[in-house]
Amino acid sequence: MDKYEQLNNLLEINSIIAVKGVAAIFNGNMQIRNPVINVFKENINYSDFVPEYDIPKNLINYFNETINNLEDKYKKIAIAATGAMGYDEKRWNQFITCVAAEKFHGNKRGGLFLHTVGVMKTIENIIVDYIINPFYMSAKDSINKDRLMLKAIVHDIMKIKEYDYEGIIRRKSIKMDHLVMGASYINEINNEVGKVLDEEELDDICYSILSHHGEFGNFEPKTIEDVLLNAADIIDSQIVNAIENKI
């Protein structure tokens, strides 16, 4: 077995290694002579190696306060789905450290949380201008503001299962995307918290998740809440993409 085969057997994708040897320049390239390679597999803090957003405390406070102001049934779904406020530390840690995308926007650890807050704030402005303090006509009979905000909170929640983000950020080789998994997950969460949503409302929320990619997805937005969630998702992702990629 040659050295390359030995290394292939020793190393895996996202392995953290330490290399010790003599650094030298050969033909203009840096080389390490007589390398000794050690692989670390335990007690690894990937935030030391993987790009990560610094999430301000005030955004976490905003997230929690927004959830606490929701109607009780939507509040229960939001807390259980994200693991917020101590409900489930594992879920919360996954949610707050996951990426929003592999390349397009929010492609650092913490990107999913920041994108979620961006969509929430976009929806919040719509709620203020068209329901709470309408500038002309009120949409309170057309839009359930708390349900719409819940949709903003959970619309991308299953990106935690779609992406690898401990090490090289990449989409997993899976057939179902986060939209399909997200709709299924909310159904599971509803069962977990005592079926606080009836079948009609559960179907409505799940369909909004399935259709929030609009023309780029497999499900077409049907209701005004579907359309608004899709629009808010586009607004935040496009703005962040413009900022980060300077387009």
Predicted feature residues:
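OB-fold single-stranded nucleic acid-binding module
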Residues: 2-49
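Generic alpha-helical secondary structure signal
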Residues: 5, 57, 61, 76, ...
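Glycine-centered flexibility sites
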Residues: 14, 21, 28, 110-111, ...
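Acidic/His-rich, divalent-metal-binding segments that scaffold phosphate/diphosphate chemistry
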Residues: 48-172
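Divalent metal-dependent catalytic cores for phosphoryl transfer on phosphate-bearing substrates
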Residues: 131-245
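Histidine-centered, transition-metal-coordinating active-site segments
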Residues: 1-6, 13, 50-72, 127, ...
